Curated annotation (Swiss-Prot):
NCBIfam families assigned to the protein according to its UniProt record, in alphabetical order: PRK00451.1
Source species: Bacillus cereus (strain AH187)
Catalytic activity: N(6)-[(R)-lipoyl]-L-lysyl-[glycine-cleavage complex H protein] + glycine + H(+) = N(6)-[(R)-S(8)-aminomethyldihydrolipoyl]-L-lysyl-[glycine-cleavage complex H protein] + CO2
One Pfam family matching this protein: GDC-P
Protein name in the entry: Probable glycine dehydrogenase (decarboxylating) subunit 1
SUPFAM superfamilies to which the protein is assigned, alphabetical: PLP-dependent transferases
Subunit text: The glycine cleavage system is composed of four proteins: P, T, L and H. In this organism, the P 'protein' is a heterodimer of two subunits.
Cross-referenced InterPro entries: GcvPA, GDC-P_N, GDC_P, PyrdxlP-dep_Trfase, PyrdxlP-dep_Trfase_major, PyrdxlP-dep_Trfase_small
EC number, UniProt record: 1.4.4.2
First and last residue of the signal peptide: none
Family: Belongs to the GcvP family. N-terminal subunit subfamily.
Length: 447
């Protein structure tokens, strides 16, 4: 039988076998003992035509709670944000839609400039001097930042706030184990890093301190106070930040952060079951030659025209092999492009307005919950997430909400035993007043 995408005739098979010097398929696999060869018929359905296959896959996909039909209040690192329509158009162009790393600048100026623009916008948002072309996601960016700090300071202890995303902390633990580094968690108090505990833990053995801004609970950390503690012992100050929040919050670079990392998912990258994402990594000029990942620089060609190239390549795996600054090399260029297009389409004022709407709508939701008798756990300033005490298992609440076409918030009890029955609610610019009111009313009815 001829298949549409497997056009191999019997004549093709015969020619291939002759080329490699065997006569039959059995002879090709003669090294595999007869006793372990499968001789029956596979219990699978008959092949389907393309229309039949599309229909079946559509039926399977319809079982998912998709964000076109459900109002999502689930965040915890992956958010339902508006992506300008132009994003999909640009990233679908054949010039970009490839995993090829642009080693040859003479044929890759478009890709290189797109990466350069991404780096530039990340620097503008974070207040840092230099940014790389992307990382896999926020978690790997955080771990890579810690590895840079340990290598630079030659110290073995990493302090990380317990208010940093649990999955990012898990990635950090994996990296640290391989490098024989000690990871110490700093407890949170009232939803933010406990500064008294941090002060007692920072000493001359600490390579870096890592906090999140806004943190996993949505709270805005006091970066100015943390920076003073961190730099007393010449440790590095690493901040993981939601880039959209920086449209409203003071950039970490203004507070003296040495490295700012995070996930660019809020800009043009759909939730898509949790990935793939696009991490970013920004730092100061002092660490430019130690930064992981690709770096694109601007230069001029022999005719004096502006051009773009991969620069400082001696840091990288294809040059230095095991001595490279990182083993991340296949970057997220397509997702970085999506983020770049989204940021460009929104513009500076658009990013600010998008951030403002997140704050405004989240504040409205908080007031509605309190008016309904719910306790909002933490009283400090927050961006677009806050914690609500459900007084009962969050899974039960979310199961009930799902029946009303609502995707509820994140169950904090999965990661924090002290926050059992607490829900992390995310409210983005896409949520309407009616959707927020419906969420609060439905949860009130479940109480």
């Amino acid at each position: 039988m001829l298949h549409r995408y497997l056009p191999m005739t019997e004549e093709d098979k015969k020619e291939m076998l002759q080329t490699i010097g065997v006569q039959t398929i059995d002879e090709l696999f003669s090294d595999i003992p007869e006793s372990v060869r499968f001789k029956g018929d596979l219990k699978i359905k008959e092949a389907k035509s393309e229309p039949e296959l599309l229909k079946e896959l559509s039926q399977m996909a319809s079982k998912n709670a998709n964000l076109k039909e459900y109002a999502s209040f689930l965040g915890a690192g992956v958010y339902d944000h508006y992506a300008p329509v132009i994003v999909d158009h640009v990233i679908s162009r054949s010039e970009f839609y490839t995993a090829y790393t642009p080693y040859q600048p003479e044929i890759s100026q478009g890709e290189l400039q797109a990466i350069f623009e991404f780096q530039t916008m990340i620097c503008e948002l974070t207040g840092m001097d230099v940014a790389n072309s992307s990382m896999y996601d926020g978690g790997t960016a955080l771990a890579e930042a810690a590895m840079l700090a340990a290598g630079h300071t030659r110290k073995k202890k990493i302090l990380v706030s317990s208010a940093v995303h649990p999955e990012s902390r898990a990635v950090l633990e994996t990296y640290a184990k391989g490098q024989h580094l000690e990871v110490v968690e700093i407890n949170h108090k009232d939803g933010v890093t406990d500064l008294d505990v941090l002060q007692s833990e920072v000493d001359d053995t600490v390579a870096c301190v890592i906090v999140q801004y806004p943190n996993f609970f949505g709270q805005v950390e006091k970066l100015a106070d943390i920076e003073k503690i961190v730099h007393q012992q010449k440790s590095l100050f690493i901040v993981s930040s939601n880039p959209l929040s920086l449209g409203a919050l003071t950039p970490p670079g203004k507070f003296g952060a040495d490295i700012v990392i995070g996930d660019a998912q809020p800009f043009g990258i759909p939730t898509q079951f949790g990935g793939p994402h696009c991490g970013y990594f920004a730092t100061t000029k002092a660490f430019m030659r130690k930064i992981p990942g690709r770096l694109v620089g601007q230069t001029v060609d022999s005719d004096g025209k502006r051009g773009f190239v991969l620069t400082l390549q001696a840091r990288e795996q294809h040059i230095r092999r095991d001595k490279a600054t990182s083993n991340i090399c296949s970057n997220q260029a397509l997702n970085a492009l999506a983020a770049s297009v989204a940021m460009t389409a929104l513009g500076k004022q658009g990013v600010k307005e998008m951030a403002r709407q997140n704050i405004s709508k989240a504040q409205y939701a908080k007031r509605q919950f309190e008016a309904k008798g719910f306790t909002v756990t933490f009283a400090g300033p927050f961006f677009n997430e806050f914690v609500v005490d459900c007084k009962r298992p969050v899974k039960e609440v979310n199961d009930a909400l799902l029946q009303k076409n609502i995707i509820g918030g994140y169950d904090l009890g999965r990661d924090y035993k002290e926050h059992e029955n607490h829900m992390l609610v995310a409210v983005t610019e896409l949520r309407t007043k009616d959707e927020i009111d419906t969420l609060v009313n439905e949860m009130g009815a479940i109480q």
